[in-house]
């Protein structure tokens, strides 16, 4: 993806920057909720790597792995881009539940639908804004082992 813009959720990520994006998710009743996205873009173009965790709200270990990954000093020399989503299932994390409040498994709801259940709507936003992005050379979602 040389010499091209990197735009996620209408936010342009410039070379050599670290950006936090709060992607708006479907509301739960009248409560606004955001999906935290951390983007670390090196000063030079290179591969794009995507890592996500907590697609199930009871899988907390990946959140800590991503937190530690973000602090690695080697990222100051990054050539390329690292896109991190430490908590995909924000609703499940709030309740320490594998599922969303509609009792659906987010991991089984992709690619989602904007008219569907809460899980389907969350999947649609996440899929359209992040997962369907075609320039990834590597993606990893962290689950319990």
What does each of the following model-derived ranges do?
Residues 1-145:
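Structured catalytic-domain cores with a bias toward divalent-metal coordination
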């Amino acid at each position: 993806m040389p010499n091209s813009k990197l735009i996620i959720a209408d936010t342009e990520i410039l070379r050599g920057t670290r950006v936090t994006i709060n992607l708006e998710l479907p509301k739960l009743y009248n409560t606004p909720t955001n999906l935290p996205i951390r983007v670390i873009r090196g000063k030079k173009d290179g591969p794009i790597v995507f890592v996500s965790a907590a697609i199930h709200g009871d899988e907390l270990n990946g959140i800590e792995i991503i937190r530690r990954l973000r602090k690695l000093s080697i990222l100051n020399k990054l050539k390329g881009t690292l896109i991190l989503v430490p908590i995909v299932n924000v609703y499940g994390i709030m309740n320490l539940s594998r599922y969303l409040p509609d009792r659906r498994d987010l991991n089984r709801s992709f690619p989602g639908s904007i008219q569907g259940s809460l899980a389907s709507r969350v999947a649609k936003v996440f899929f359209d804004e992040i997962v369907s992005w075609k320039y990834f050379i590597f993606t990893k979602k962290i689950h319990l082992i």
